[in-house]
Each structure stands twice: as structure tokens, then as C-alpha cells.
Amino acid sequence: MSNIIDIKAQESVTALEDISVQGEKDRQEWSQKAEVLCEALPYMRKFAGETFVIKFGGSAMGGSKSLKNFAKNVVLLKQVGINPVIVHGGGPQIGSMLDKLNMKSSFIDGLRVTDSDTVNVVEMVLAGSINKMIVSEINAASGKAVGICGKDGGLIKAKKLSRTKKDPDSNIEKILNLGFVGEPYMVDPEILGIFEDSDIIPVIAPIGLGDNGETFNINADTVAGAIAAAVNASKLIILSDVDGVMLPNGELVSYLNIVTARKMIKDGVISGGMIPKVETCIEALESEVGYAHILNGSVDNILLMEIFTESGAGTMIL
């Protein structure tokens, strides 16, 4: 009998020890959460009432997990008093749809040549499929999102993008024909102002309207920068599939000013697809946007880490 009592007593002691250990883990976890909240609170107060334009790239969407996490982050921003305006891309998704339709697609200097048939597919994928997918995820995360494109209400007036390239044989600058690839020349901020004073989060597809009713395919980074300037946003945030501006040794550049950013482009430190992103940020800053950020949108809670922590998580240009 005494052996049974000893065993039961030992089991009780073990159970109490387990509870004690679990209790300590819970206390540590809650303490960490409290520290995070204390660090975030000053930033929440600082940015309440401010407008952030967030570009969510097609390459940053990854799988449904990345999109769901993005939606939750955006809803939280709205709930703490920040006004997020979402602009999305969709390059990989457009390419996939064109392949399914057996439509050939070519690029010149990183820009998709967009003929009349291609622009219809671009509009269908951007303003239809992707836009509504993002809207649905934000709504599922207890937010209120409305999807629009630049043609709606004349939000984005666009013109044909003019690009030239030097012919290697004749050394003459020749005009490139990119079809219905456009650039915004006017953004109507009044349309977005309607959403600012409500619970609604606007989700914008980068399609523009020409003066003659044409539909233009516009680079999403460019659209985000133009909208940020038009609404006097305090932040332009570009979410892509890279961590930010990187040095040749692989080190992340956490902070950049405009002068240094331009020098890094000139010296070739910033190259490839990062150049137009940084140039968009510079143009936005020169148009009185407060700060610009480039982040890896595939990282969970990247928006919250960048906005609400002192260390940040990507590259901030100021």
C-alpha cells in the first residue's frame, strides 16, 4: 500500500512540476507579447489618421498563406486608425493566364508588350481575378474592402508610355512600341477620400483610362507611387519577393536617403528589378510622401514589423 501511495505522490509532484513549468512558459510568452505591444503603442499613436499606400506585388503573394497574412496585417492597420490603400500587381498571374490561352508574350526592358488582345487579358486578371481575391481575403479577416481599378470613376488617367532605345548598329535612339502600356498623368484623390473617412479599405488594380477611352496596363509600383503622391501619404510601402535593397555581400540596407540611393543606382549596387522600385520611391519622396519602404511580402507579419518596431524589417528610404 505504501508503494502505491509513494507512486501517486510522485505522480502528483511531477504533475505540479509540469504545471509550474508550463506556467513559467505562459508568463514568459505573455511578457514577450506585452513588450511587443509596448513597443508598438507609440507608433500606433503616431500614425493614427495617416494614409499608407501599400503595393502588394504579384510575386509577393506566393501562396494563400502569404495573402491571408497580408490581409490580417492590413485589417489591423485599419483597426488602429491607419488608412491603408492597397495597390496590387499580378505579373506572374498574367503570364500564367496568357500561357493557358496560348497567347505569346514578350518583354522589352522588363515591360510586357501589350497589344489589344493582351490588354484584355491583363484587365481580366488584374481587375477581376486578383483584385477580387485580395478583397475576399481582407473581408474574411473581418475587414471591409472594396475592389476598384484605375478606370473606375476616372481614378487614374493614363497615357501611352514613351520609351526609346539606342539601336546598336545605327547608334540612333528609336521609339519602342509597347502597345497599351501606359503611365499615369493624373490621379483623382477625391475618389479615395471617400474611403478615408469610412471603414472601407480600397484595393486598386493598376489599370488606367486613356483620353480616348483606351485601357492601359500600368506598372503597379508606378501606380502606387502616383497614388501616394496624390493623397499625400505618409508612407509608400512596396511589398515584393526580396528583403529590400541589398549590398553585394548580401547585407540588407536598412536606411537610405535619396542622394545615396541615386549613387547606388549609378554605381550599379542597385540593379535589375530593384531600380524601378527605388526610382518610384524617390519620385514619391520628392512629391512630399513622408517615407518609402521596400519589404519582402512573403515574410509573415512583415508590415507590422516594419511599421511598429524600432529596428524595422526592410529598407526605408527617406
What do the predicted segments below correspond to?
Residues 313-318:
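Long, charged amphipathic helices and adjacent flexible linkers at domain junctions
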